[in-house]
Amino acid sequence: MKKLLVAVLILISAALFAGTVSVIGPWSGVEMDAFIPVLEAFKAETGIDYTYQTYRAEDLANVLPAQFSAKKSPADVIFMWSSFITSNTKSIVELTEVIDTDAYIPGALDNVTAADGAVYGIAYTAKVKPGFWYRKSFFEAHGLTAPSSWDEFVALLEKIKATPGIKNAIASGNGVGWPLSDVTEHFLIAFGGPELQKDLIEGNTSWTSYAVRNAIGKLVYLIERGYFSEPTEWTTILEQWWNGEYGLYFMGQWITGMVDDSDDLAVFSLPGSRGMVFSIDYAFVPEFAANKTEALELVKFLSGEKGQSIQVSQGGHIATVEVYVSNYPPVDKEIAKLTEGVETVNDLDDSIGGLWQTAFWDQLKLLWVRPERLDDVLMDLEQKMPE
C-alpha cells in the first residue's frame, strides 16, 4: 500500500509540472550533446518536456530588445551575457527567492545581481583559467614538482630552463595579444588579490599604481630572465609544448580537449592566489516567458547540485555550486580542487572591452619583447581607459 501511495504521489507531482520549457543556449555540436543529458535528467525528475535551440549571444542582443518591447520572448530560459541581464531587469524575472543564492561559490552571482541586491539570473557552470599546465610525464621524467611558494616557482623555472632540449621554461601563446592577457591577469590576481582585478575593471585603481606595478613587475622579472618564450601563435606553441620544447603553458580549461592524452595533464596556480578568472554561462527567465512556471523549475534545477553534477561529469565544465569532486573526469578534478576557497573574478580585458582591449593586447606584446618598457606600458593603459 505504501509503495502504491508513493507511486501515486510521484505521478501527481509530475502532472503538476507537466508541460514544456523552451531553452535557448550557445552550445552546438559536441557541446550541445554534453548539455542535453542535463535537460533529460530534468525531464525525468519533473515530467516537464523541453525544446532546445542554439542562438549566438551576439544575435540575441539584436533580437531580444524588439521581442521584449512587444512583450514576447523567443524562449522560456535564455543563456545570455550577464551585462544584458542586468541592463534589462524590467523584462526579466527576479530569482532571488527562487534559487539558493547561498549555495554558490563567492562572486558567482555578482554579475547578475542588481545594486539593490536582487538577483536576475543564474550562474550555470563555468570554464576557468586555472594556471600553468604541464605534462605529468615530463615532470616525472625530470624529477619536478609543482611549487608551493614564489621562490619554489622561480626555482622550478630555473630547473626547467636547464633541462636539455628545452627552449624556454614557459611557452608564450599569442594571437591578437591573447592569451598573453590571461597570463598577465593571473599575476594581477595572485599578487594584488581579486580586489585589484575588480578595481581595475571598475576603474577604481590606476594602472600606474603601486599595486599594479608590483604585480606585473613579478611577471617582468620572469620575462627578463628568459623564462618566457617569445610570443608565438598559441596553437602552434601548444603543439611544441606538448612535444617537450617547453615545460609550462598557461591556458584555460579548454586545453583538455586539445591534447592527445588529457590524463597526462596537470595544472597549478601561482602559489597563494586567492582568485581565478571564471567564464560563467548565465541564464535568465524573461517576464514574457510562455511557460514561466516550468522555466522557474528548470533554473532551480540548473542552479542546483544535481543539475550541475550531471553537466560537469560530461567534462570541460566547473560547477558554480558545491558538487562532489567524484563527479568530475580525472583532469577536471584537479581544476575543481584549485577552485576550492577561491573567489571568482571576471576576465579583465573582456569586461573593459572596446578600444582599450586592443590597446591592452598590443602593449602586452610589446612588454614581452621589451620588458624594460613596463612604465610606458602602464602609462599607456591608464591613458586609454574609458571614462
Summary of predicted features, one role per range:
Residues 157-158, 201-231:
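Glycine-centered hinge/linker elements that transmit conformational signals in sensory
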Residues 81-130, 267, 333:
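Hinge/lid segment of periplasmic solute-binding proteins
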Residues 26, 217-291:
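Extracytoplasmic/periplasmic substrate-binding proteins
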Residues 92, 257, 281-355:
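Mature extracytoplasmic/periplasmic domains
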Residues 120-124, 130, 154-202:
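Extracytoplasmic/periplasmic solute-binding protein
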Residues 18-85, 101, 146, 253, ...:
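Conserved N-terminal structural module of periplasmic/extracytoplasmic solute-binding proteins
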Residues 94-111, 170, 174, 191-214, ...:
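Short, solvent-exposed loop/beta-turn-alpha elements that line the ligand-binding surface or hinge
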Residues 44, 49, 140, 224, ...:
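Conserved C-terminal helix/tail region of periplasmic/extracytoplasmic solute-binding proteins
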